[in-house]
Amino acid sequence: YGMDMQKAEEKDVNTYPTPDELWEMTFGEADSINQDAGEWRDKFHKTPFETRSGTWQPRYYQENAISNALDAISKGQNRILLTLATGTGKTAIAFQIVWKLFHSKWNLRKDGQQLPRILFLADRNILADQAFNAFSAFEEDALVRIRPSEIRKKGKVPTNGSIFFTIFQTFMSGRDENGNP
């Protein structure tokens, strides 16, 4: 009797499959479809964690969250939701995901030639500032803190970095079709 957990199928089996048949049943289709995904997954996993000179190591659940998010990204998933309780290190998890994306040069073109552009969106300025400070291991010119007041002054959104930090309200700082703020 055999069960395919991915296809949710069950059926009688007359003979045991050979190791090669098992491999093909398990990974064959996925290998041909997700070869690119496998290459990106390998790049992500080869990029070491930023450990702050050995003073920080991810907890097991943080490592699982980072790994699962990067696997989903490598497979081309556009929406990924991580839900964790207060005090579990969501900012540290986000930092490590961004660290690996940045250093593997992952981007939407998936060409590995250009640094990614990443938006860290928070609901309060204090959280955006906290995240901006937590990302201090990155080169200074990679980080940009976007404030609504700066957009109003300059009339445009800064584009001179790779990792941008702001709050939701920043997107409401422009003018409507009538020119009203």
PLM feature spans:
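ATP-dependent helicase/translocase motor core
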Residues: Y1-R117, I126, Q130-D141, T159-I163, ...
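Short beta-strand/turn micro-motifs composed of small residues
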Residues: A122
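Acidic/polar loop patches that form or flank catalytic/metal-binding clefts of enzymes
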Residues: D141-R147
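Conserved motor-coupling elements within RecA-like helicase/translocase cores
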Residues: S149-F164
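Short, solvent-exposed loop/turn elements at domain surfaces
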Residues: S173-R175
